[in-house]
Amino acid sequence: MRKPYRKVVVGGTFDRLHLGHKALLRKAFEVGRYVYVGLTSDEMIRNKPYAEKILPYELRLMDLLKFFEVNGYTNYRIIKINTAIGFADRIKSLEAIVVSEETYKGALLVNRAREERGLKPLEIVTIKLVKSRIGPKISSTLIRAGLIDPFGNPLKKDN
């Protein structure tokens, strides 16, 4: 199958790699021949909910590398990012950005930053949120809070 884009970008914290992250990453590799992955630095995540429970950058990086290896993905580059835009406004050859419904507004910010630098805006490829069994979506925040597992299943509380 021919992939519609030569180079795509996707970004995130990718803490406790869950089904939502995997769907996002799979879509990026499905539509792009080469995937740039922006992985948030430890400094960037300090103000996230349950920040103290977010895995360090190196462990999140290892989880991504393991996921890519298991799935046979070899056409990628992971770059540490310190801002929401990261490097997406500096690589001229990017053609698309892959986001979830929830992060669509971030793609608009990336495109605005690209236009300010005289670069062509990216096509926006959007995936639906992956639902959990207890709420509207699987999220790392719910996992860090101990409410669900990475598959969206509720965790049993000790009585």
From Swiss-Prot:
The keyword Cytoplasm applies. Its EC number is 2.7.7.3. It is found in: Cytoplasm. It comes from Thermococcus gammatolerans (strain DSM 15229 / JCM 11827 / EJ3). Reversibly transfers an adenylyl group from ATP to 4'-phosphopantetheine, yielding dephospho-CoA (dPCoA) and pyrophosphate. This is Phosphopantetheine adenylyltransferase. Belongs to the eukaryotic CoaD family. One of its GO terms (biological process) is coenzyme A biosynthetic process. InterPro entries: CoaD_Thcocales (IPR054937), Cyt_trans-like (IPR004821), PPAT_arch (IPR023540), Rossmann-like_a/b/a_fold (IPR014729). It catalyses: (R)-4'-phosphopantetheine + ATP + H(+) = 3'-dephospho-CoA + diphosphate. GO terms for cellular component: cytoplasm. It comes from the Archaea. Signal peptide: none annotated. Coiled coil: none annotated. Pathway: Cofactor biosynthesis; coenzyme A biosynthesis. Pfam families: CTP_transf_like (PF01467). GO terms for molecular function: ATP binding; dephospho-CoA kinase activity; pantetheine-phosphate adenylyltransferase activity. Disulfide bonds: none annotated.
